[in-house]
């Protein structure tokens, strides 16, 4: 099947304006190999460059939702890195500390749920009528009922 690159580029351009990210250089890269994610974003804060990775066979059915989600990670990157650094200052850089693992897990859960809530709200406020993607939840349902 594959994703439509020009549609994705239009969505990135549209949402760069809405999210006030016009000062960033954002490149789109389609991931052709098997990949567990629908999307990701790699960020160079010093140079204000980012590469948005989109799975050519995404689990997400709403590409606009996927683009907004990844761009919000870019928008929140500074705060994300500050909080990760804070957790590392408290618990150290080493692995295996259950308190640090707990703090990091809670932080990432809160970050993802916040990004998801902001994504849904922004899509609705900007008139996106396409149904939200239930890809991750659908996978759980399929494994539960044997589809």
What kind of region is each of these model predictions?
Residues 2-61, 78-147:
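Metalloprotease/metallohydrolase-associated module, dominated by Zn2+-dependent proteases
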Residues 65-77:
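Active-site recognition of the HExxH zinc-binding catalytic motif
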């Amino acid at each position: 099947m594959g994703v439509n690159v020009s549609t994705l580029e239009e969505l990135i351009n549209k949402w760069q304006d809405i999210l006030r990210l016009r000062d960033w250089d954002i490149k789109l890269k389609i991931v052709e190999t098997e990949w567990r994610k629908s999307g990701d974003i790699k960020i160079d804060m010093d140079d204000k460059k980012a590469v948005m990775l989109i799975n050519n066979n995404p689990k997400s059915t709403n590409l606009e939702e996927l683009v907004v989600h990844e761009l919000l990670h870019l928008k929140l990157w500074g705060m994300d890195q500050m909080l990760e650094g804070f957790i590392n200052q408290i618990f150290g850089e080493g692995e295996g500390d259950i308190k640090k693992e707990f703090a990091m897990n809670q932080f990432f859960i809160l970050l993802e749920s916040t990004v998801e809530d902001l994504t849904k709200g922004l899509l609705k406020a900007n008139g996106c009528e396409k149904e939200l993607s239930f890809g991750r939840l659908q996978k759980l349902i399929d494994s539960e009922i044997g589809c």
